[in-house]
A protein has these predicted regions:
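His/Asp/Glu-enriched, well-ordered alpha-helical/loop segment
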Residues: 1-79
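C-terminal cap of metal-dependent C-N hydrolases
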Residues: 2, 7, 74-120, 124-126
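Compact recognition or signaling/catalytic modules
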Residues: 103, 133-134
Length: 136
C-alpha cells in the first residue's frame, strides 16, 4: 500500500500516532538504517507525494511542475528526527491524543505561503477543502 497511514485515521489517536510515518521513513529507512535495504531518497519522496496523490485520485498534485498544485516541505535532512511521543489533552471534553513532534522541518508552504517555520505555526491558513478526485 502506498498510503501507509490512512487506514483507521483518527480512530485510535489516544494510543498511537501514525502521523510520524513520513518522518520515520525519511530519517530511518532512507538515512539511518544500518541493516537491510535502505530506500533511495527519490523513492521515498515519490511514495509520499506522487504515489499517494494518485492513490486518492488527485491527478493535479504530487509533483513540482508547471500547472500542478503543490504544497512543499523544506527539510534539513541531517537534522530530521522524531521527538519522543507524548499524550496531550487538547480534544473536545479534554480527550487525549498521542502526539509526536519532529525536528528538521525548516518550513512548510501551502499555496505558496509559509504556514510552518522551524516548527512554529505562522498563522497563515491558505489551504482549501477538496472533495473527490481532482483532474490535472
Amino acid at each position: 500500500s502506498t498510503v501507509i497511514s490512512l487506514a483507521d485515521t483518527g480512530a485510535h489517536c489516544g494510543v498511537l500516532c501514525d502521523a510520524s510515518v513520513p518522518t520515520q521513513m525519511l530519517s530511518y529507512y532512507v538515512r539511518d538504517r544500518q541493516r537491510g535495504h535502505r530506500l533511495a531518497l527519490e523513492t521515498a519522496v515519490k511514495m509520499q507525494t506522487l504515489d499517494t496523490a494518485r492513490c486518492v485520485g488527485l491527478e493535479d498534485r504530487g509533483t513540482l511542475e508547471v500547472g500542478m498544485k503543490a504544497d512543499m516541505n523544506i527539510i534539513d535532512f541531517d537534522e530530521l528526527q522524531l521527538e519522543a511521543p507524548e499524550i496531550i489533552f487538547d480534544l473536545p471534553a479534554g480527550g487525549r491524543r498521542m502526539f509526536q513532534g519532529a525536528r528538521g522541518y525548516v518550513a512548510t508552504l501551502v499555496s505558496g505561503e509559509v504556514i510552518m517555520e522551524n516548527g512554529k505555526y505562522t498563522g497563515a491558513v491558505p489551504g482549501q477543502l477538496i472533495r473527490g478526485p481532482q483532474a490535472a
